From Swiss-Prot:
Residue segments, region Cysteine repeats: 7-21
Coiled-coil ranges (or none): 31-83
Tagged with keyword Membrane: yes
Organism: Schizosaccharomyces pombe (strain 972 / ATCC 24843) (Fission yeast)
Name of the protein in its database record: Autophagy-related protein 14
Subunit description: Component of the autophagy-specific vps34 PI3-kinase complex I composed of vps15, atg6, pik3/vps34, atg14 and atg38.
Topology in membrane: Peripheral membrane protein
Pfam families per record: ATG14
Swiss-Prot/TrEMBL keywords: Autophagy, Coiled coil, Cytoplasm, Membrane, Protein transport, Transport, Vacuole
Domain of life: Eukaryota
UniProt GO MF annotations: phosphatidylinositol 3-kinase regulator activity; protein-membrane adaptor activity
Gene: atg14
Family from the record: Belongs to the ATG14 family.
Main location (coarse class): cytoplasm
GO cellular component entries: autophagosome; cytoplasm; cytosol; extrinsic component of omegasome membrane; extrinsic component of phagophore assembly site membrane; fungal-type vacuole membrane; phagophore assembly site; phosphatidylinositol 3-kinase complex, class III
Length: 390
């Protein structure tokens, strides 16, 4: 309760109070209240300042603690770095010492090997040359054995052709007349392939030393002789090719025999056949007919074996139609396999010989749009080819 000086009347008449004294008391009360409120606000401001200062101090304390922790980590990392640098220096020194020791040992070993290198290189070079010559001899022997096997297979199936064939070429007629009865007909037959393969040695027309007319005349003359030779070839007494309507076809009576010949030659020369062959199993009766595709398979397989054996190389100037015509003369290819030697080059199976079977088949269909009935082309009874097999 505020203590204010009262008038005498109010002092005597307690607890009553007059209006003037009441005003004084109220004035004093509001005045005191304002002072208290100002004091409270100032104190609140001080408290707020103290709070902000305490927050800043707390942040500084936290930052100080973090810095202290980082300093401790930095000191620990510095100590670790010093220890690692010491270890690295020691390891570096050990490696340098090891390298110096190894260099010394290498120098000593190189000095020792210097005296032996010359003799060792001579020894290995001699061994390499010896092995290379031995491999060449073995390769030549292998080709000789393969050639003997090819000859025996073709002789076993009684391959024959016109032995007294005289070529219409310069030099061959004179040679046959000079040698008389001692003349070897195999050399004449093999020269057919030689004369055409000789054209493949040149890279351009200028290398052939022939004009276009002379080259065309040579091709026509050569193909006429190939046709004459092909028409005279027989297997087991049966013509390999027969003519029908001025076109040459593979004799179906020889299909089974030629299939066995292809299999034997591919086995003895280690040449994979590009086309499958159809053979009867032992418990089946002999096949009475072959399909047109089987006949094409046989023709293509024989040309494939001849080409991969190095018997014949197609010239660069030959056209596609001429190549297709030449590949159909199966008798000619059999004669080349019988008369010409094998080459020593290893064939590349991934290299195409100029015409794959798909192109060969398409050209055949274009030449004969109507499939031919091979049963109508038989030269004699179908039981004839199976006599030798049985």
């Amino acid at each position: 309760m505020l203590h204010v000086n009262k008038c005498q009347l109010c002092e005597t008449r307690r607890p009553s109070i007059c209006e003037s004294c009441l005003k004084k008391q109220l004035y004093d009360f509001y005045h005191k209240r304002d002072e208290f409120s100002r004091d409270i606000e100032s104190e609140l401001e001080k408290v707020a300042k103290l709070k902000s200062e305490s927050f800043s101090l707390k942040g500084k304390i936290t930052q100080k603690e973090e810095l202290t922790y980082r300093l401790q980590n930095l000191a620990a990392s510095l100590n670790e770095k010093k220890s690692l640098s010491c270890d690295l220096h020691s390891r570096k020194q050990l490696i340098e010492d090891d390298l110096s020791n190894r260099k010394k040992s290498i120098n000593i070993a190189s000095q020792k090997l210097a005296g032996l290198s010359h003799s060792t290189s001579d020894y290995f070079s001699k061994e390499y040359l010896t092995a290379y010559r031995r491999s060449e001899l073995l390769q030549n022997k292998l080709h000789e054995y393969q050639k003997k096997l090819i000859t025996r297979v073709l002789d076993m199936y009684q391959l024959h052709w016109q032995r007294d064939l005289v070529l219409n070429t310069q030099g061959c007629t004179q040679k046959s007349a000079q040698m008389g009865s001692e003349f070897n007909p195999d050399s004449i037959d093999s020269s057919l392939a030689y004369r055409l393969s000789k054209l493949s040695m040149g890279n351009s027309k200028s290398d052939l030393s022939h004009s276009d007319n002379e080259t065309g005349h040579f091709y026509s003359n050569f193909f006429s002789q190939v046709m004459e030779l092909n028409a005279s070839v027989t297997i087991s007494g049966i013509p390999v090719c027969i003519r029908s309507k001025e076109k040459m076809f593979l004799n179906p009576d020889c299909a089974l025999t030629l299939s066995f010949i292809c299999i034997f030659l591919a086995q003895y020369t280690s040449i994979p056949l590009p086309c499958p062959l159809q053979l009867p199993s032992p418990d089946q009766k002999p096949m009475t007919s072959f399909s047109s595709e089987q006949m094409l398979y046989i023709m293509y397989n024989i040309v494939w074996i001849s080409w991969n054996c190095g018997i014949f190389s197609f010239p660069r100037g030959i056209t596609q139609s001429q190549l297709f015509e030449l590949m159909q003369y199966t008798g000619f290819w059999l004669v080349q396999l019988r008369t010409k030697p094998l080459t020593s080059q290893k064939p590349d199976w991934h290299y195409k010989m100029g015409m794959d079977f798909d192109l060969f088949h398409r050209l055949y269909l274009a030449r004969l749009p109507i499939p031919i009935n091979y049963s109508s082309l038989r030269s004699r009874s179908s039981s004839k080819p199976y006599q030798l097999i049985s």
